[in-house]
């Protein structure tokens, strides 16, 4: 959803994100988008009937709910890399440990990671202090350049788009448990990363100033 009228805060946050996406790739200063979504685990109550030359695979309409999981999507759009972490919950502590993995495992040699994310209340520096001692929390805070999409501007977060691809290519069927979910996502992730599939993003600040002119204050 885009605001219907002039909104200086929206365009300021939007341009900050767009300028980040316009940067040339630099491994010392990677751009990383993060988003998350819940997932429902569903078990079959009857064994599906395999496909035949005359019929596709047939699945009974009944299923059994088997809990939920949370998916953290991390997507580096300039290099075509993504990583999905499956957790039981989506607390501040879960979020903090995902950031620690980014900083220390996936991008240990980066000087600063430009982190683009939505304005969820857990997506904050404070979450690191809930999970780690102060010195460690501060170290991790300083590894990131914290950027937020504007309110009603989650479409600017490329991790949201990548979650959409994941949902359509991998999560479009019943997945019975967390272990199966992790395995299915890992296979999808491996294929996407092997092909270095990047974001097909062409929206720039100059584009925004023309197409979204109504959002800019009249001066």
Feature locations, PLM:
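Mobile genetic element proteins and their domesticated derivatives, centered on retroelements
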Residues: 33-35, 74, 80, 99, ...
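Short, basic/hydrophobic alpha-helical segments
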Residues: 93-114
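A short acidic (Asp/Glu
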Residues: 43-44, 124-130
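Active-site proximal helix-loop segment of RNase H-like, two-metal nucleases, encompassing DDE(D)
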Residues: 159-178, 191-195
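C-terminal domain-tail junction helix/linker
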Residues: 3-6, 45, 180-219
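RNase H-like polynucleotidyl transferase catalytic core
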Residues: 58-64, 136-158, 174-176
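Extended, low-complexity cationic-aromatic segments
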Residues: 13-100, 212
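Acidic/histidine-rich, metal-coordinating catalytic segments
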Residues: 110-124
């Amino acid at each position: 959803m885009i605001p219907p009228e002039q909104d200086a805060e929206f365009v300021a946050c939007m341009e900050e994100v767009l300028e980040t996406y316009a940067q040339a790739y630099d491994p010392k200063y990677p751009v990383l988008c993060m988003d998350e979504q819940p997932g429902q685990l569903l078990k079959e109550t009857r064994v599906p009937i395999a496909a035949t030359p005359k019929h596709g695979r047939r699945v009974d309409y009944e299923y059994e709910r088997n809990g939920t999981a949370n998916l953290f999507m991390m997507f580096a759009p300039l290099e075509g890399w993504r990583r999905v972490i499956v957790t039981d919950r989506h607390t501040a502590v879960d979020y903090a440990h995902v950031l620690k993995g980014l900083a220390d495992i996936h991008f240990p040699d980066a000087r600063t990671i430009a982190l683009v994310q939505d304005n969820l209340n857990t997506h904050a520096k404070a979450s690191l202090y809930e999970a780690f001692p102060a010195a460690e929390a501060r170290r991790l805070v300083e590894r990131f350049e914290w950027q937020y999409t504007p309110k009603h501007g989650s479409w600017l977060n490329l991790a949201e788009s990548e979650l959409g691809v994941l949902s359509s290519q991998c999560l479009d069927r019943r997945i019975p448990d967390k272990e199966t979910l992790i395995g299915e996502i890992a296979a999808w992730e491996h294929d996407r990363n092997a092909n270095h599939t990047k974001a097909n993003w062409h929206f720039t600040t100059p584009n925004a100033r023309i197409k979204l002119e109504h959002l800019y204050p009249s001066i």
